[in-house]
């Protein structure tokens, strides 16, 4: 019984020591949460505002397949304000209002190009849509969802240029 109690005491001390450690990201959690990362990086709560920029995907338009991927059901995770018939600016404005009602602490936003493959278009179109989003005064950066086979060197160069003055 004494040996078992001693073992339990050692386990408890070990767990306390682990939980008291600060990890390289400055937190005592074993993982670096996205919200904590943004709070450290920007000094405030940052909220993603989803945007549907009207892009398609090679698994939808016939280049690779039809019907899309099983896991990519945009209707399941797209907010009601997020419609490709609306301008990027209008979606951002409506998204910010939505998040202000829901998360009152957010004061800066990331334009989240979420629906489908957001690099599956000519660079001029991408540039126009990303620039429109990044020109909004409350948007501090962009999060761009895509497929690796839809990212060219030219697009990567553009992202590198954007990243000099924006969070990308």
Sequence positions of predicted segments:
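Short, Gly/Pro- and small/polar-rich lid/capping loops
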Residues: 20-40
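Canonical Radical SAM [4Fe-4S] cluster-binding loop centered on the CxxxCxxC motif
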Residues: 41-87
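Core AdoMet radical
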Residues: 75-95, 99-123, 138-151, 167-168
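Distinct, well-ordered alpha-helical segments
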Residues: 123-131, 152-162
């Amino acid at each position: 019984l004494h040996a078992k109690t001693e073992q339990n005491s050692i386990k408890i001390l070990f767990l306390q020591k682990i939980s008291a450690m600060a990890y390289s990201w400055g937190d005592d959690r074993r993982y670096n949460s996205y919200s904590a990362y943004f709070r450290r990086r920007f000094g405030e709560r940052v909220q993603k505002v989803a945007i549907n920029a009207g892009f398609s995907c090679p698994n939808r338009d016939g280049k690779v397949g039809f019907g899309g991927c099983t896991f990519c059901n945009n209707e399941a995770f797209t907010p009601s304000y997020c419609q490709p018939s609306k301008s990027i600016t209008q979606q951002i404005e409506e998204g910010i209002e939505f998040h202000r009602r829901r998360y009152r602490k957010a004061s800066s936003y990331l334009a989240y190009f979420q629906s489908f493959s957001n690099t599956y278009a000519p660079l001029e179109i991408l540039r126009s849509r990303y620039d429109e989003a990044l020109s909004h005064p409350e948007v501090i950066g962009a999060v761009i969802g895509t497929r690796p086979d839809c990212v060219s060197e030219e697009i990567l160069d553009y992202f590198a240029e954007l990243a000099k003055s924006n969070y990308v």
